[in-house]
């Protein structure tokens, strides 16, 4: 359970005492019985996170001290909050230090800055419960309740309310970051969205620049732009009182290739026509899940889950109209879900994030791409061909097409580091399996699948009329591998596009020694 407190603020620029002495945080080394517990708190069994030392922190001062100790000891620094990264950015340095942020999960209101404060170790589930039950507000974050805000917000953050309220970073007022200067001195800096703030560029870099780049984020302050007054209930979005939903399903046996093309075109057309910032259709969020075909077909091989804001008949009518459009000419089995309270739908009683500790997925690989419009017919055929011949060793092979756009697209691309501001869908490609002996074959299948979908643009979603790069919160080191990215477009342009040069300048200013680095980290400007 998150720790909810009253007002508090850490002094800006707090500095740890220099030297190699042990910091105040708990230091956990191999051989300590706590080490194995910390090492296993990752979400992907493909990766090993066995550093020289874990530092379990409980305050900004302890983070400053832990970073200073690592710098003075010459050890690489990694940061982990929820441990959901799709790549092994945290475990890249076996001789390094992993700073574990899960002990910093307080949520409170700061009256001086008129903003709600979230510590980095707070899970989305804790945030949703606390914000809503305390003040009746929320943030438009993701569905996985065990994700911590530490990484989620830095990469942009989106979820079922984003079409109505934008990305999470669109509500970010301030961020506290422990940085290391050129002299090797660790200190905490608070940066805000105020244009006159001398640290404004550091705030901007955390509105989509991705985790592990500039320092250790300890706290976020959230307040919606233009929000007035000092009542927390008026400073962040209010979720709908209730949600109405439904599912629409097909078996692979129901959808030969021509029907699959029709379904995908229907789905894309609806999103292309209903994703402007002021469209009434933004009150609806849906996920189309396309699962790899198994030996035994399932009634839910292809499934659309939709939710709509609005009480009673209005929400149900929007979902029904959406299902009518998507199922035109292809049928499908439809089940409507009665209206229920918002928090109950978001966090059903049997879905508590504490039950998700440890490895959630087995062995896992993910890829992603933004879509400005639907896939071409050739891309749709590629998706069909790969999913209907998915190898049996995969526990799950799936493409997710998630509603996007709406208010997300009401923000200029350069206003935040999150640059993709005219897409209507996010595509995610996932594969999970259990046996480590299947690693090579499983990875190869997903990599070839993704490459073939984007074969016209060098195997990756190069920004053009259809694609718009990828999402840094779904990191994929293959984008930096010339064997899988033959486009000539570097990985950082797929994630950050025209914002990358500015991010490099921020990196040079705030992490000139490149203390915080991993396979997809931003490089300091020359």
Where are these regions (language model features)?
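C-terminal cap/substrate-recognition region of VAO/PCMH-type FAD-linked oxidoreductases
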Residues: 189-477, 484
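Glycine-rich N-terminal segment of FAD-binding domains in flavoprotein oxidoreductases
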Residues: 32, 43-105
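Conserved oxyanion/phosphate-binding beta-strand-loop segments in alpha/beta enzyme cores
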Residues: 17-42
